[in-house]
Amino acid sequence: MAPGGVVGHRLAFMEQLHDVVLVVDFGAQYAQLIARRVREANVYSEIVPHNMPVRDMLAKEPAAIILSGGPASVYVEGAPSVDPALFNAGVPVLGICYGFQAMAQALGGQVAHTGASEYGRTSLCITSAGQLLSRIPHTISVWMSHGDSVSRAPEGFSTLARTAGAPVAAFEDVERRLVGVQWHPEVHHTESGQTVLEHFLFDIAGCRPDWNASSIVGDQIAQIRGQVGDRRVICGLSGGVDSAVAAALVQRAVGDQLTCVFVDHGLLRQGEAEQVKNDFVAATGADLVVADESQRFLDALAGVTDPETKRKIIGREFIRTFEDVAKRLNADQPIDFLVQGTLYPDVVESGGGEGAANIKSHHNVGGLPDDFQFSLVEPLRTLFKDEVRAVGLELGLPEDIVWRQPFPGPGLAIRIIGEVTAERLEVLRTADAITREEMGAAGLDRKVWQCPVVLLSDVHSVGVQGDGRTYGSPIVLRPVTSEDAMTADWARIPYDVLEKISTRITNACPQINRVVLDITSKPPATIEWE
């Protein structure tokens, strides 16, 4: 089955088991955040494009529909619009920001250029709580991002709230179960935002809160057994949480029909290869084949400094190594399926969901050779990262694996700016291990999304160590906070923790005489340096 068919079948399977809330994506990054907030309320959600025909949306039998925000103005030629038929289908609908304005326009309300744009924190006054805003304080701080405003609600709708720049900041038609808000309840900066969403999901739409780690595990085990039957499966373990949880799910479903392959490319952090070989096997009982190919990867990377070339070489060598192992295993007993740890954001961002725009390619979604003769098993393809961690804990995986910070597939190779050598890898491993140890001791390891440690091996910085002048390389600390890695802010690490990290690194690594802190958000910078 083609990957698109796999995801379509898996999504349809979820729709049969749970109430589904469709999040209609109007082109901003808010759709994923809305979908995650719905799932935090224990309700299953899916993202669909704004140009999906209403009949196709209704074919999914949604319990509710949410129209997301977006960057367009309803007055711009070619701006996304909403088919009015959606509001006559009897399905509860919540419009947010642009979705609120498009909803108002489609139903005969008025959207105007008021000249009073609102961006960021804004004071909102609730004028009539209604059903949507019941039990919400009279005045709250909300997150706004709009230039146009609804100036008149559609006929039959009650106006619920206003701000200085939005005379109609929320409305509802209780009888038709149609509601909307100008602000972003899904953003953490909005006070009572999750409460507003849950009023819509439970009080207005009547959704069932049955989406949780236990139900996900049960659903996926049934799905995997139905797909695999009595045939054999192979899984490539990277040392990361995604592949570990995917493998553990398949192991729980089909037992010794699964063989895991760990390609040790020598580019992992300190202790991670041993963690895969020992802790994962002990927790799952999985059959593990280890291919130690560190020298092969170092030889292939010799003399290479361009980051994109590094990525391509590592990807090529990984696939070749994995294929070699798979062929040997397949010769003993045929293997039909390959497990991948693809996540739902990978699918959405790669345009592999339901027609979404292709933002970027992902190594889990594309990149496999055309002649790769396995059918894909992707048990995490409907899940966000926080759900993957919850499933990992439900399956009994060690916390060190479940809470492992995101780590790039090419490993430390793209955290060395310059040529990758055995000596540079050892220096970076030591600096990274010290950083992780001190962050953990300070209780920051789960508060920080990730903390890349980067070696600027081609930069030489003058220093004084002992009684002499040195020319060493700087180490960069890149701690960031994020929810999904699409955007990130630099993490405010206490100075005393930074001091300990810097002192320990420069003492342990004579090649390093300077430790610097990257305080750039994403955008404009990416999280990784290469």
Curated annotation (Swiss-Prot):
It is an enzyme of class 6 (ligase). Keywords: ATP-binding, Glutamine amidotransferase, GMP biosynthesis, Ligase, Nucleotide-binding, Purine biosynthesis. PROSITE patterns: GATASE_TYPE_1 (PS51273), GMPS_ATP_PPASE (PS51553). It catalyses: XMP + L-glutamine + ATP + H2O = GMP + L-glutamate + AMP + diphosphate + 2 H(+). Residues 211-404 form the GMPS ATP-PPase domain. Signal peptide: none annotated. Residues 20-210 form the Glutamine amidotransferase type-1 domain. GO terms for cellular component: cytosol. ATP binds at residues 238-244. Coiled coil: none annotated. It comes from the Bacteria. One of its GO terms (molecular function) is ATP binding. Pathway: Purine metabolism; GMP biosynthesis; GMP from XMP (L-Gln route): step 1/1. Its EC number is 6.3.5.2. The active site is at residues 97, 184, 186. The keyword Lyase does not apply. Homodimer. Catalyzes the synthesis of GMP from XMP. This is GMP synthase [glutamine-hydrolyzing]. The gene is guaA.
